[in-house]
């Protein structure tokens, strides 16, 4: 069993963006390819949780396993994706990554995983005052908590965190760059993120 593994969540419908965000162009490739390049430089095992509509397209782009949600919980949001990844790869800790934060750096995963310890169920960054539960790490013991929530038709990350012993880490305390956490939900945000990148 690995100590650490990565789970990339690419199962959302991207309704506000107008097309699958995982496949949006970024620095000569796509969001999903760029994110995986960053993650696989730090983590030996990574799995992508994909929506069935784009699974084949994602598989052609990446060299890691691409799976769908566990059938019983299909479409139940990020909790379903996280638990599906946990079932696919056995590890002590899982670094979670959405497919719409293309600025993420391999440094972030190094910092995040250095903060893990057995006394905690989760390590969650707080960036500019906001919790970032989808750019976080979760111990494998939260798997049972997620199943319980899904069985009760509870789907929010906040409901999971309320049941966990969470280590919250402030971005400024760990030298995390706030730009790593910018997520792209609309075409306007996408254009701005590309402008910011070209101005660096």
Curated annotation (Swiss-Prot):
Its EC number is 2.7.7.77. Transfers a GMP moiety from GTP to Mo-molybdopterin (Mo-MPT) cofactor (Moco or molybdenum cofactor) to form Mo-molybdopterin guanine dinucleotide (Mo-MGD) cofactor. GTP binds at residues 9-11, 21, 69, 100. GO terms for molecular function: GTP binding; metal ion binding; molybdenum cofactor guanylyltransferase activity. This is Probable molybdenum cofactor guanylyltransferase. SUPFAM superfamilies: Nucleotide-diphospho-sugar transferases (SSF53448). Mg(2+) binds at residue 100. It is found in: Cytoplasm. It comes from Bacillus cereus (strain AH187). GO terms for cellular component: cytoplasm. It catalyses: Mo-molybdopterin + GTP + H(+) = Mo-molybdopterin guanine dinucleotide + diphosphate. It comes from the Bacteria. The lineage of its organism: Bacteria, Bacillati, Bacillota, Bacilli, Bacillales. Keywords: Cytoplasm, GTP-binding, Magnesium, Metal-binding, Molybdenum cofactor biosynthesis, Nucleotide-binding, Transferase. GO terms for biological process: Mo-molybdopterin cofactor biosynthetic process. The keyword Cytoplasm applies.
């Amino acid at each position: 069993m690995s100590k650490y593994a990565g789970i990339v969540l690419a199962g959302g419908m991207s309704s506000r963006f107008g097309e699958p965000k995982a496949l949006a162009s970024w620095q000569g490739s796509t969001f999903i390819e760029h994110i995986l390049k960053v993650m696989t430089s730090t983590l030996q095992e990574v799995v992508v949780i994909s929506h069935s509509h784009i699974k084949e397209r994602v598989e052609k782009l990446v060299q890691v396993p691409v799976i769908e949600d566990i059938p019983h919980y299909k479409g139940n949001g990020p909790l379903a994706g996280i638990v599906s990844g946990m079932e696919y790869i056995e590890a002590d800790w899982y670094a979670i990554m959405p497919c719409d934060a293309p600025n993420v750096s391999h440094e972030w995963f190094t910092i995040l995983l250095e903060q893990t310890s057995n006394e905690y169920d989760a390590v969650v960054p707080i960036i500019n005052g906001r919790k970032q539960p989808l750019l976080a790490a979760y111990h494998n013991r939260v798997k049972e908590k997620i199943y319980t929530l899904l069985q009760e038709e509870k789907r929010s990350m906040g409901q999971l965190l309320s049941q966990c012993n969470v280590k919250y880490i402030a971005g400024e305390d760990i030298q995390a760059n706030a730009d790593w956490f910018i997520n792209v939900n609309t075409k306007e945000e996408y254009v701005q993120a590309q402008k910011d990148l070209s101005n660096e």
